[in-house]
């Protein structure tokens, strides 16, 4: 091979490799998503502000990517990871039991029996009491949401994400309802 031909060949080969890399880069870089990518969560309070000495609710809205599901709180099998929400209440606050929605029984190719799952948009509700001693102003209630997201092909590792419920506390007379579409009794 003549030097000029070798340079041309090397340059052409490099161009082809670059073109193939660009064409297939999305496939080469595609990764299995994480549980954090599959479920996007938002936190809302039923009162804005909430009244000192009163009660309110916190809603955690889970938006689950199409094609995925998470196990419901009432799981179908012992080995499954149930959806779980925990709160760490600061001084001046107490809370009740989390209200989980009823799951849907779905059949998947990997299981012989239907599984109790959440799909799409799911709302978890946590009742909270702001005691008469609750500090006024912006307060934070740390939350931890644990779930395991699965598709029909794979289950991702269990995921625990920290969330923050930001609540403004005012005198009881200033309390006003907020985000009622998330807290109506029909949901």
List each language-model region with its residue ranges:
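Extracellular/lumen-exposed scaffold segments
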Residues: 26-187
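Bacterial N-terminal signal peptides
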Residues: 10-27
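Positively charged n-region of N-terminal signal peptides that target proteins for export
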Residues: 1-6
